[in-house]
């Protein structure tokens, strides 16, 4: 298995964590355990891993989409992409690896349980430390591909100043 998803019990049901949430949890856990080198994630993934790496004094690379690019990061300590592909032990497997990811996630969950907390509590701790960044995939289909270029040009020319009533603080 090359992928690993995680879900948490919430209000009598289960909520699947996003790839970005799981990536933040894994990156933070590995950094707290003394990881050295560089973290990496694809450009379509959250910027949160970069903040986590900076907080712990680690390097961070943003790569093109696809694990072949993440795996090329020099001194890779941890890499992920939002499509639930994680590389928590690049010295053992320098690719996305669901098996080693499940072992690391189980260890993190056990740590949370021992502290009478949860994975969601740990995420809140991460957000309190480095800032919250939430992502949500958006898919739309068009028949005329030039519409995508037009839409991106329009957003670049006049970036939004607010989203869902909240001010936009920075546009990259």
Task: Enumerate the predicted regions with their spans.
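Phosphate-binding and adjacent anionic-ligand microenvironments
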Residues: 1, 9, 15, 33-172
